[in-house]
């Protein structure tokens, strides 16, 4: 195990140029060569991941992370564009033979979560987020995504002259969403030309989760849900806590709204036809225990898998919230922002890519995965070019599936052995796509 002090030293000691893997310029890199290269780079991937995990950064604040990425890519001979989409990095590797352009994407941002993993390289970082000082943790595995894509960069750089086409590596900030009032994520990366300089023909992404280690799963067409940020504001009348009848009881308003949201999601729409979720996770009101405040702000999220269901739920939520406010003599409004569309896996690419994934993890590929109510702004890339988004299982040995910490948990961790599988999956998807007729 690498301790807290030795992690950076290990990265520095291993940060060397990638060796050439194939001296025959006319031949595509073989499966054995890719496997050997992925195995060789595994210690570096682990070191990168531990370093990034120990130094997490929130969305649009990934300055240290992006500097590390740019440094490593430049050392490998990539053409590097920095400050794309604020703190994003794009690395371009032009192969020795002409061909198409394929992109691979990793997200870089962490979450305002207090880490409880007990790892030697656990985060102790605090940062400012929306006016508050918060703990910061890589609780969704983005540290592993960056490390694996750097490993992929190392493997690809070692076979550059045998690559038929160009590989674009997109290291994206703010996938979890920017702070209120900011822009960020895939939207800004696309606006800054991440898919256009050069013009990308297809894009692939990998995301770790608590499934069986080394399992690669995905499904054609809709895979991850669409996502909308929900903000509910209520304006009432302040009163003393001892005289609630003289004002608007905001606690009762909040309780009724929460109950109504649960009713809408579970009782007013056909849950069998298309899954949907409406969740309230934030309630802000009041400063003293004996004063009923004038204002209430609630925050949540909505997840759907079809445009029709999304539009229907938005209308229902807005109508219901306004009606509850009227009932209490308050003005209540529901606003939906930061929409992410459904993450759509191109059917043709989904069928084709299974063979590439089988080479990365033989016998552990599921191309009929269940729908995921999580959301991803990778979906914005998939709106622009054909795409496939794949999940990589990373549950540690001995951890029961039923109790494995999920993404966004303060206990979330990943079996480091799966990084090698992730690197192979990314390399095979990229190379096989470029060799595809």
Regions inferred by a protein language model and the residue ranges of each:
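Bacterial N-terminal signal peptides
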Residues: 6-19
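Sec/Tat signal peptide C-region and signal peptidase I cleavage site
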Residues: 19-26
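Metal-dependent amide/peptide-bond hydrolase catalytic core
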Residues: 28, 75, 255-437
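Acidic/His- and Gly-rich active-site-bordering loop/insert found
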Residues: 28-138, 147-168
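Soluble non-cytosolic domains of exported or imported proteins
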Residues: 39-46, 56-67, 139, 143, ...
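Divalent metal-coordination and catalytic microenvironments
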Residues: 52, 91, 104, 142, ...
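Hydrophobic beta-strand positions in extracellular immunoglobulin-like domains
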Residues: 93, 234-236, 302
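Histidine/acidic-residue-rich, glycine-tolerant segments that coordinate divalent metal ions
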Residues: 126-137, 143-144, 155-156, 161-279, ...
């Amino acid at each position: 195990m690498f301790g807290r002090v030795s992690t950076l030293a290990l990265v520095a000691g291993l940060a060397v140029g990638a060796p050439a893997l194939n001296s025959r310029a006319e031949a595509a890199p073989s499966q054995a060569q890719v496997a050997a290269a992925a195995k060789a780079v595994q210690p570096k991937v682990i070191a990168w991941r531990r370093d990034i995990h120990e130094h997490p950064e929130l969305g649009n604040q990934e300055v240290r992370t992006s500097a590390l990425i740019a440094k490593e890519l430049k050392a490998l001979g990539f053409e590097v564009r920095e400050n794309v989409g604020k703190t994003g990095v794009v690395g371009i590797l032009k192969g020795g033979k002409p061909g198409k352009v394929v992109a691979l994407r990793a997200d870089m941002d962490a979450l305002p979560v207090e880490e409880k993993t007990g790892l030697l390289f656990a985060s102790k970082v605090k940062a400012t987020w929306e006016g508050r000082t918060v703990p910061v943790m890589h609780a969704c595995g983005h540290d592993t995504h960056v490390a694996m894509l750097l490993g992929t960069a190392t493997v690809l750089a070692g076979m550059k002259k045998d690559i038929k086409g160009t590989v674009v590596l997109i290291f994206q900030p703010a996938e979890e969403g920017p702070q209120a009032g900011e822009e960020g994520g895939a939207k800004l990366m696309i606006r800054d030309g991440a898919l256009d300089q050069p013009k990308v023909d297809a894009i692939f992404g990998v995301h770790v989760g608590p499934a069986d280690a080394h399992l690669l799963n995905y499904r054609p067409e809709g895979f991850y849900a669409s996502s909308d940020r929900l903000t509910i504001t209520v304006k009432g009348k302040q009163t003393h806590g001892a005289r609630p009848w003289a004002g608007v009881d905001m606690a009762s308003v909040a309780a009724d709204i929460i109950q109504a949201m649960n009713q809408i999601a579970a009782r007013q729409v056909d849950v069998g036809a298309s899954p949907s979720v409406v969740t309230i996770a934030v309630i802000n009101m009041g400063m003293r225990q004996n004063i009923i405040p004038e204002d209430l702000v609630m925050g949540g999220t909505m997840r759907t898998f079809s445009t029709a269901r999304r539009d229907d739920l938005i209308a229902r939520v807005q109508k219901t919230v306004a009606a509850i406010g009227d009932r209490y003599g308050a003005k209540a409004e529901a606003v939906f922002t930061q929409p992410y569309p459904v993450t759509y896996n191109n059917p043709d690419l989904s069928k084709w890519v299974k063979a590439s994934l089988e080479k990365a993890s033989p016998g552990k590929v599921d191309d009929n995965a269940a729908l995921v109510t999580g959301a991803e702004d990778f979906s914005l890339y998939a709106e622009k070019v054909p795409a496939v988004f794949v999940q990589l299982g990373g549950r540690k040995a001995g951890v029961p599936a039923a109790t494995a910490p999920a993404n966004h948990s303060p206990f979330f961790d990943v079996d480091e052995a799966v990084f090698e599988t992730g690197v192979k999956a990314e390399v095979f998807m990229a190379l096989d796509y470029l060799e595809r007729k």
